[in-house]
């Protein structure tokens, strides 16, 4: 009888741990290739700065590519925070937009309907620089 209880608890805990470990994993951020981007426009409130320097674009794309997926979902066109940075990747074929923001002391990128990604503060501060 005691062995049955121990075995039942073991199976129960194993099932729970398996379900938790196999939760939905977020996909990495989807970005255009650096050589396809003609410029990156960064908008903070009403101020927009356009960056067309290929070196700057490549560095920013590399930094953004290293962002870590979170389990948070993006279900809106815009982040649900008061203040955010809009990042428009201008391509010859159109525009791709992501957003950067700070929430509870952590910095994130949000790609509408794709995912939310954690970034380091250094990248966030770089994006905030309006020259």
Please report, for each region that a protein language model flagged, where it lies by residue.
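Sec-dependent bacterial lipoprotein signal peptides
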Residues: 1-24
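Function-determining sites in protein domains
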Residues: 2, 22-131
């Amino acid at each position: 009888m005691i062995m049955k209880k121990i075995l039942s608890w073991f199976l129960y805990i194993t099932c729970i741990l398996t379900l938790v470990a196999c939760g939905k994993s977020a996909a990495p951020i989807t970005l255009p290739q650096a050589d396809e981007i003609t410029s990156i426009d960064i908008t903070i409130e009403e101020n927009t700065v356009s960056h067309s320097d290929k070196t700057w674009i490549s560095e920013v794309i590399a930094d953004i590519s290293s962002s870590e997926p979170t389990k948070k979902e993006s279900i809106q066109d815009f982040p649900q925070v008061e203040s955010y940075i809009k990042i428009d990747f201008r391509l010859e074929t159109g525009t791709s937009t992501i957003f950067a923001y700070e929430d509870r002391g952590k910095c994130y990128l949000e790609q509408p309907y794709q995912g939310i990604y954690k970034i380091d503060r250094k990248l966030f501060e770089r994006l905030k620089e309006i020259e």
